[in-house]
Structures are given as C-alpha cells and as structure tokens.
C-alpha cells in the first residue's frame, strides 16, 4: 500500500469463502430517462459517441465499444446492468444464482434475451452472459506528467483537445443494505471486496484482473443509480473534462480531486437527472489472482485525499 493511500485507521477485513465461478466484466449498463434528446446532448458534451436506434440510444467510448444504452421512461432509473463471463463459468454462475436465491426472469423487457436474467436483492434487473473480457487485463496506461528543463510543460489553452473517455471504468449503485448487496454479488457473481467503509460504502472487483472497483455500493434508504465512471488518460484530462462540461452548460459537480479507495483522480458532473458521470484517471489495478488486502476504512479516510468540499447533492438519491 503506497503513501497516497490512507491506512492509519485501516481495520483488517477477513476474506469470505470465495465462489468458484465469477464474471469478468461489466458488458454495459442501461438507464431509463424521461427525454432521450436531453440525454444525447449531455453524453455528447461529455465526450461520448451516441448512436440512435429505434429502441434506444447506444453510447460508445473512444474504444468504439457500446458501454451503455439509454431508454425512454417516466423517470431516471437503472433499467438493467449486464455482466459478461467466460463460457466455462456460465453454468457455475447459474448454480450460484440458484443457491443465492436470485429470482430469475424468463422474459426481460429488453431485446437481448441471451444469458440469464435475474433480480438482485434490491430489485435491480441484472444480466449475465457469455462474452469476451472487456475489463482491462493490465493497468490502463497513464500519461507521464512533467517536462524536462528547457521545455514547456503545457500546451496553450486554444490547443487543448476535446476529452474523449477511453472506456467505462465502473458503476456505483445506491442500496438499502451494503452488506446484503455485497454478499449477493460475492456469492452469486464472484465479485471480491476491494475496500469498504463500515456499512456505508463498498468496492468490488472481478478476480480475472480488474480496476480497483468494477461495481461499488453505497448506503441509501432505497435502491438507485449514483454514477458511471469513464476512464481518461490523466489528471489533466480530468480537469479538462470539467472545463469542457462547464463550457457546455453543465456547471455543477464535484472535483477535481483524488480518491483514497481506488486512488483515482476524479471529476463528477451532475447529469440532468440528479446522478453523475465521472471522469476518472489512474485508478488502482488488481491483477488476476492477486490477493488484494481489502481494508475497512474510517469515514474521514474513505472518500477523498484532496479536493473541494463534497457538495450536499453528491450523496442525494433522487430515486428514494
């Protein structure tokens, strides 16, 4: 654990028994929102590519992969969350779902019926299907900062390029019970605890090589969608993304700062529905097979190392 990571009040976390089978990636997430035109403007300003289909908006990052779908609905909510697994894990995951008491869904509302669909303990619709690993298999390269003596270290403002996120990094869900959700995603889908802060927030990773968190869970009075995080090259792109969104009229958010759990640089942009999109750079990476020393951190050491004060609306669940 490096000196950037708060550890003075870290309490050891005994590992739970690990299931044999696990997902390896988030394939994509899907939201329902009241107005797709509003969603398209926001996502385009953020630096993502949006394609309209007869059913929804498909959202692509710079890697030209569809990471999200937006459907029209009465209000903003998570439509579903889709995970991918290797073929050799699929049957075992189905058995783990049955053992965990998951409610299977035979006829999901959405077009893709592949894999297995079910509700998690909070009532979120989830899909697991066989697919290629799309989570990184090594730490995403970050640009080196600084310039040698005798050279300029920054381009002029007029030459700053538009920030285009490289890929989806992770998502965070509100849950009435962090421990219950953590137990389910561990026992049913094989996700492993990375770090936590009591029963307030927990971060999980996939065992096949994963960012520090693939799925995060935070305490609320109800289920809900908090944010999706998108990987960018460095802290400059985090700050440039904040400026890019402010210029487009999206001025509310939190950052720029640096997290403790995950260590990533961040800026969160408030979206039109009260949740967030995050620019994220240089997040910790957990290689396949590595035993990560999961910690239980005090509240004051669990959120950020530096940055502006947290706005009140950052922890508001607009779906509660």
From Swiss-Prot:
Enzyme class: oxidoreductase
GO molecular-function terms, A-Z: catechol 2,3-dioxygenase activity; ferrous iron binding
Annotated TM spans: none
Record's catalysed reaction(s): catechol + O2 = (2Z,4E)-2-hydroxy-6-oxohexa-2,4-dienoate + H(+)
Claim: Metal-binding is one of the keywords in the record: yes
Record InterPro entries: Glyas_Bleomycin-R_OHBP_Dase (IPR029068), Glyas_Fos-R_dOase_dom (IPR004360), GlyoxalaseI/FosfomycinResist (IPR050383), VOC (IPR037523), Xdiol_ring_cleave_dOase_1/2 (IPR000486)
GO biological process entries: catabolic process
Cofactor(s) it depends on: Fe(2+)
UniProt KW Iron keyword: yes
Positions of the VOC domain: 25-131, 167-282
EC number of the protein: 1.13.11.2
Domain of life per record: Bacteria
Cited SUPFAM superfamilies: Glyoxalase/Bleomycin resistance protein/Dihydroxybiphenyl dioxygenase
Residues annotated for Fe cation binding in this entry: 170, 227, 278
Region Disordered: start-end pairs: 1-21, 131-153
Family, as annotated: Belongs to the extradiol ring-cleavage dioxygenase family.
Protein name as it appears in the record: Metapyrocatechase 2
Organism: Cupriavidus necator (Alcaligenes eutrophus)
Gene: mcpII
């Amino acid at each position: 654990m490096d000196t950037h990571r708060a550890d003075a009040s870290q309490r050891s976390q005994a590992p739970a028994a690990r299931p044999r089978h696990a997902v390896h990636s988030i394939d994509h997430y899907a939201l329902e929102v009241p107005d797709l035109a509003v969603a398209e403007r926001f996502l385009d300003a953020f630096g993502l590519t949006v394609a309209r289909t007869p059913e929804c908006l498909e959202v692509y990052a710079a890697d030209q992969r569809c990471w999200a779908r937006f459907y029209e609905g009465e209000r903003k909510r998570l439509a579903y969350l889709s995970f991918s697994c290797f073929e050799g894990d699929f049957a075992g995951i189905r058995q783990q779902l049955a053992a965990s008491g998951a409610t299977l869904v035979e006829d999901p509302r959405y077009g893709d019926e592949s894999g297995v669909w079910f509700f998690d303990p909070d009532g979120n619709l989830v899909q697991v299907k066989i697919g290629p690993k799309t989570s990184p298999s090594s730490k995403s390269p970050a640009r080196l900062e600084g310039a040698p003596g005798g050279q300029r270290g920054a381009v002029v403002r007029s030459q700053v390029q538009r920030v285009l996120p490289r890929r989806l990094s992770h998502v965070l869900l509100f849950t009435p019970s962090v421990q219950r959700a953590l137990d389910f995603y561990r026992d049913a889908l094989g996700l492993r605890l990375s770090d936590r802060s009591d029963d307030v927030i927990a971060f999980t990773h996939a065992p096949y090589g994963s960012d520090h968190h693939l799925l995060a869970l935070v305490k609320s009075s109800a289920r809900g969608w908090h944010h999706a995080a998108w990987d960018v090259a460095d802290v400059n792109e985090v700050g440039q993304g904040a400026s890019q969104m402010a210029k487009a009229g999206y001025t509310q958010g939190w950052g720029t700062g640096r997290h403790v759990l995950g260590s990533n640089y961040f800026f969160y942009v408030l979206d039109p529905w009260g949740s967030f999109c995050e620019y994220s750079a240089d997040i910790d990476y957990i290689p396949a097979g590595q035993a990560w020393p999961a910690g239980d951190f005090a509240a004051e050491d669990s959120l950020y190392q530096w940055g502006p004060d947290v706005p009140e609306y950052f922890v508001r669940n607009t779906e509660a």
